[in-house]
């Protein structure tokens, strides 16, 4: 799975809580969100440092706008991230309720380890192996 296809699939399956997500789909989407956060923070720092000496009152308005847009971007990506994490747990043949581990501090470390685990080979109760589907798509594209 490529970087762009993983992002497209995460948005396409944002409200799909069934099925499985491969490691590449999950980690490419995490990388995309990390890049997005980096860009948003860079814009906010740039605006703060370049407009600090402005006495027009524009700076608080622009900072407020950038904080609002950053919050909106975060809000928009909560559902796809929740969905792909749940489907990633399914890929390891684990129930989705394990996502609730993120509520406790050490639970995030446990979830991180679960996200690193390889897929369950073959089909499991949550659906077919996503690697098999990726191989079929790749073979079809090569023809």
What are these regions (language model features)?
Residues 1-4, 58-83, 95-117:
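Selective recognition of hydrophobic, aromatic-rich stretches within alpha-helical transmembrane segments
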Residues 1-32, 81-97, 114-143:
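Membrane-interface extramembranous regions at the lipid-water interface
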Residues 33-34, 105-108, 133:
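Solvent-exposed loop/turn segments at secondary-structure junctions
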Residues 37-38, 108, 120:
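A short hydrophobic/aromatic micro-motif that marks alpha-helical segments and, especially, helix-coil
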Residues 37-78, 142-143:
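Membrane-helix interface segments in multi-pass membrane proteins
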Residues 44, 48, 105, 114-117, ...:
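A generic structural signal for secondary-structure junctions
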């Amino acid at each position: 799975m490529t970087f762009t296809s993983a992002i497209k699939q995460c948005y396409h399956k944002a409200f799909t809580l069934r099925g499985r997500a491969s490691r590449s789909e999950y980690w490419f989407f995490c990388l995309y969100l990390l890049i997005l956060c980096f860009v948003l923070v860079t814009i906010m720092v740039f605006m703060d440092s370049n407009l600090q000496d402005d006495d027009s009152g524009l700076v608080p308005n622009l900072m407020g706008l950038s904080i609002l847009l950053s919050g909106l971007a975060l809000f928009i990506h909560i559902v796809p991230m929740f969905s792909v994490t749940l489907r990633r747990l399914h890929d390891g043949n684990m129930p989705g309720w394990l996502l609730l581990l993120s509520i406790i501090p050490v639970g995030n470390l446990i979830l991180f380890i679960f996200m690193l685990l390889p897929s369950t080979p073959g089909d499991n109760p949550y659906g077919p192996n996503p690697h098999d589907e990726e191989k079929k798509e790749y073979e079809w594209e090569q023809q």
